[in-house]
Amino acid sequence: MFYFPVEYFLQVYSLPLIGEVRFQKDYFSEYPEQIRVGSDGYDGLRLRTAVSYIRKPGYYAVHYNQPGTVAIGAILRLNDGAIAVFSGEPNQSEQGILSPVYTLESNASLAVPTGLIFIRFAESVDVESQREVINQAGYEVAQSLSYAPHTAWLRAKSGKIVDAIAGISQLEAIANVKSVEPQMLMERGLR
């Protein structure tokens, strides 16, 4: 038989000291853990169902100022290379805006928020007539759609993605709003 002194056993199998335990930093704690889009119930003749995006730890996205940026080590490139998704912890020296990565609850596809929010009013309500209310909610019209004057793409006045997502409930509270959804870019899939 072979015997080990108890001291050696305790050194090998003991837990690390509290000071040595490192908790992974949550770089995106200001972002919601879940983003719920849509609603349950009837919208006209078709049934709309709610979709949930869940924040995925261990991944982050870098939003570059120009498309086509070479992103070494990226696991996914979106929007012609303007957004790159990486695994691991973000490097604070990254040249670009950092954001979290979400997964679509139903199929675990990676999704990245862009900071744009799509708003749709009742068809009788023109977005231009609601510009002041939109501004009071902390948003500005980024793009009006001439073929659908009751819809528009919005962005937070601050320009921050986190502010755009955080204010969705304020937009939903505006009278005659039918739908508010953040733009979430995902890898193109074949059907």
Residue ranges and their predicted role:
Residues F2-R191:
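Primarily auto-inhibitory N-terminal propeptides
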